[in-house]
């Protein structure tokens, strides 16, 4: 019996990329165990494979990463398995050591350009530790996957490895019809903007989106998810008196989130070009907006802008500036004909950008392993 252990440091509830990996492995005949962590606010989890969410003494900082990797290492060392799948650099050390000691195959899926995230770029000593781990292990890896070609090229240039690309395009999901706005306590007479994501962190444009609402009295901004910018967003909305224009909804199951997104008029992805990770990012939310049939307002980052411009499914801004965001929103809603065209193009783009093709590519990479 083929057995795969898939590990990630989040709480498993909203990581659609990891869920897809587990589904593909299960379809290939693996018995799957997905390992993550349990947080106080973690949503309930129901999956057709085994899951383990570890309760840790530490929830952040170096002690969290040390505790998680130590516990993960011993779990991997003594659990029956034929294949290990490591998601992101913060699980790689435990997976690499266990794979080496046990002679097991290892797949590394890096969801971002990890050592270039702003949280590390702004803390050189911490970044040096992660970079040392990456430099020691990455050149030895045989099976590496990432989320887009820009990041694949950057890793190939840095380490020489061949890196496969599987984009974060969601597989088509059968969702029930979207509820009416009233059922979600949303106003009928306002244009609704949405920004969603599990990583609504600093430098991702959420603060600027909130400030833009000062100039958009006829709009409502929904921010769905979580991240380290959340307390800042709450404070901004409160201090600027924008609670009636900005609703922070927190994390929720995917289907519920898409109920809100499908009731929105415009999706926001406003990452700043302040670090290589954000520059090369291709966030899940872009594809969720397209699957919801709504146009996109995006910053001019290569991977995102290539889709928005190439599919003519939204508006690209030079940078995430509150005044520019507000002006773009006003201009878009003032031109019903242009808005309708962008909305139609978003629906067409969702059909063309087929998550099933990405799942098939992942299957071809994993087939024969373990």
Where are the predicted features?
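Conserved donor-binding/catalytic core segment of Leloir-type glycosyltransferases
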Residues: 6-7, 145, 187-214, 222, ...
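Short hydrophobic beta-strand element within catalytic cores of glycosyltransferases
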Residues: 266-269, 288-298
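Nucleotide-activated donor-binding/catalytic signature segment of Leloir-type glycosyltransferases, i.e.
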Residues: 232-259, 263-266
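A short, well-ordered alpha-helix in the C-terminal region of glycosyltransferases
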Residues: 324, 331, 338-352
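Conserved acidic donor-binding segment of nucleotide-sugar-dependent glycosyltransferases
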Residues: 310-311, 315-322, 331-337
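Donor nucleotide-sugar binding/catalytic pocket of nucleotide-sugar-dependent glycosyltransferases
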Residues: 36, 131-177, 247-249
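Membrane-proximal helix-turn-helix segments that form the acceptor-binding/catalytic region
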Residues: 70-78, 93, 97-101, 108, ...
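A short helix/loop element that forms part of the nucleotide-sugar donor recognition site in Leloir-type
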Residues: 43, 125, 175-187
